[in-house]
């Protein structure tokens, strides 16, 4: 009795191979495991004890958990979301608003002392990760550029304010930690901009090459028909 086993086709790009192995069930399990780890009081306290770790480690990990949960959604749920998220615009607008709100220093202070706000913060970041996962590809390069053109300058400006402000903006964190976070926010905004621009150029070159190849392949057929 032969047993068939689906395997990735040789030559597939690395992200195609990753998508083949990252089944919805595995993504959902990974998301729940990550959330369980982040909920451990000792780890949560360690991440939130520093301003830079709070925003640059805990925030992205919660967003990653949300992205994994979005990957575990059934097709019907994805289609339901897509109905109100045409071209990813609604999801990206909500993401920008939530990230802007969570950069307010007062929110960080309140999250450390108020469990309800802490829960709301974590839930919002998980939803942001899911929204990004469900919105990024449908958005296309134009909407992606508009989104990053708003979020990245905001991030860099907030970071520079953290660096230049001579007083603490968060009561729970030291001035040195505030300045460190500010520098990282500026560098992160610049790095994301460079990576996205490089990806945009790569995508456009590949698209033009594919179009040219299809036109060249169509020319012999057109010639044969004329003959």
What are these model-predicted stretches?
Residues 2-227:
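Alpha-helical membrane segments of multi-pass proteins
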């Amino acid at each position: 009795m032969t047993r068939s086993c689906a395997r990735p086709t040789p030559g597939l790009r690395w992200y195609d191979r990753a998508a083949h192995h990252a089944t919805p069930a595995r993504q959902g399990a990974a998301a729940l495991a990550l959330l369980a780890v982040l909920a451990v009081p000792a780890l949560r306290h360690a991440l939130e004890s520093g301003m830079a770790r709070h925003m640059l480690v805990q925030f992205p990990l919660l967003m990653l958990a949300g992205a994994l949960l979005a990957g575990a959604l059934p097709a019907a749920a994805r289609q339901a979301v897509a109905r109100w998220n045409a071209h990813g615009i609604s999801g990206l607008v909500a993401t920008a608003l939530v990230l802007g709100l969570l950069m307010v220093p007062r929110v960080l202070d309140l999250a450390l002392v108020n469990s309800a706000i802490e829960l709301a913060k974590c839930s919002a970041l998980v939803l942001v990760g899911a929204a990004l996962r469900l919105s990024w590809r449908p958005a296309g390069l134009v909407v992606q550029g508009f989104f990053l053109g708003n979020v990245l300058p905001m991030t860099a400006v907030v970071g520079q304010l953290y660096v230049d402000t001579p007083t603490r903006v968060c009561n729970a964190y030291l001035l040195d930690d505030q300045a460190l976070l500010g520098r990282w926010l500026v560098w992160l905004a610049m790095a994301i901009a460079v990576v996205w621009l490089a990806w945009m150029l790569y995508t456009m070159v590949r698209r033009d090459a594919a179009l040219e190849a299809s036109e060249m392949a169509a020319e012999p057929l057109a010639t044969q028909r004329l003959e």
